[in-house]
Amino acid sequence: MFEELRPHLIELRKRLFISVACIVVMFIVCFALRSYILDILKAPLIAVLPEVAKHVNVIEVQEALFTAMKVSFFAAFIFSLPVIFWQFWKFVAPGLYDNEKRLVVPFVSFASIMFAFGACFCYFVVVPLAFKFLINFGLNEDFNPVITIGTYVDFFTKVVVAFGLAFEMPVIAFFFAKIGLIDDSFLKRHFRIAVLVIFVFSAFMTPPDVLSQFLMAGPLCGLYGLSILIVQKVNPAPKDKESDE
């Protein structure tokens, strides 16, 4: 059994090595440009709360260095995503038919675009609104906000990556439909459960306020509907199966 899996494990190791190597190279580049990247990350806070943004602090000796490394890794991961998606496709492509292999460019492009769309939606809409709501709530309670660069970067990267990955839902649905794991009737049948899972996922991945949760859950429900339409084109349920339901 191991001998049968050996070629696949070797191929998996190769694809992982290329992906990690790309991230390492991009990390070095991004670390050299960390000041510019950090300015981009702070822009949403500056846009809505400029006075608060002037007083972002460092309270631990190692915090500045660790934050610079986190920012660099975050940017390196984002820039490496097209390569990571490409390597994933190259790993699964040998098990596909020739006509399915021609989907490699659309798959990588679609996956990259959807992640970028989710990250941009979070950057331009969710992060500014969430920060304004949360910090103003504290100010209204007579609390003095003391924001450290480490906590800001942790918050920012968590929600941006969460939105980017969440927006991959149509891509994942397309892939599962293409290999025959799901059809449109499956998604329609589990719609209510999916909405519940979306709201639970949003509650875990967003700040603890209702606004941020709905800003994630709303688009995801829409993307679930888009996934149904995509799967309906890629792997529609048989007519007799639909009539039974």
Swiss-Prot record:
Organism field: Campylobacter jejuni subsp. jejuni serotype O:2 (strain ATCC 700819 / NCTC 11168)
Summary of subunit composition and partner proteins: The Tat system comprises two distinct complexes: a TatABC complex, containing multiple copies of TatA, TatB and TatC subunits, and a separate TatA complex, containing only TatA subunits. Substrates initially bind to the TatABC complex, which probably triggers association of the separate TatA complex to form the active translocon.
Transmembrane stretches, start-end: 17-37, 73-93, 107-127, 159-179, 191-207, 210-230
Gene Ontology MF term list: proton motive force dependent protein transmembrane transporter activity
Role of this protein: Part of the twin-arginine translocation (Tat) system that transports large folded proteins containing a characteristic twin-arginine motif in their signal peptide across membranes. Together with TatB, TatC is part of a receptor directly interacting with Tat signal peptides.
Protein name: Sec-independent protein translocase protein TatC
GO BP of this protein: intracellular protein transmembrane transport; protein transport by the Tat complex
Domain of life: Bacteria
